[in-house]
Amino acid sequence: MNIIVSQEIASVCPTFVGAAVEAQVVNTPYSEALWEEIHMLEERFRQELTTESLKDLPGIAATRRVYKACGKDPSRYRPASEQLIRRMLQGKELYQIDTLVDLVNLASIAFGYSIGGFDADKFVGDTLTLGVGREGEPYEGIGRGMLNIAGLPVYRDALGGVGTPTSDHERTKMTLATTHLVVLINGYDGDEGRVAANARFIQDLLRKYAKSDGGTVTLYHFPS
């Protein structure tokens, strides 16, 4: 899998660094041990954060800055990591989908980065390009219907958009049948060490909960 960071992204976030975790996996409907980890993190965050202070977490603050630079309101189109942590802090249960989705959500919450998880066999072509959404560009967000992605950072394959920091696309979403996983970590704060640590954390989760060897990690930035 080749990943290209476009000049569009570099112009609003020259220090962007991403990480791709690619692995063979086995998905399951539910993992009790994984949810024990999620609940432990929920308890800690409820003691340490508020719905206002979470906006200052480096990964979230940097993503919000990029949204504003691209002309998008980050309070209307919240980054996924902010959505998840905000929901926890409001005392609401996180959505339980399946082990892979839940695992990616945990990784996003733990580090504050917006992370996309994809069924890599659904990509068209062997290259993803990170650019900025255009007016009128069709995009069906998972569980959200048609989403206006103009001004949102977006990964595109040969057919079109597959992932934004707000919502990934229905076409390439993970399911119980997914065996070839790609997870993309978006480090708009430019902290390569923390992005790499997030990738290693995901590898550990895959080993524990998805019958995987953890796969491989590739870091990417501009110029690609």
Region spans (language model):
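Charge-biased, low-complexity intrinsically disordered regions
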Residues: 1-224
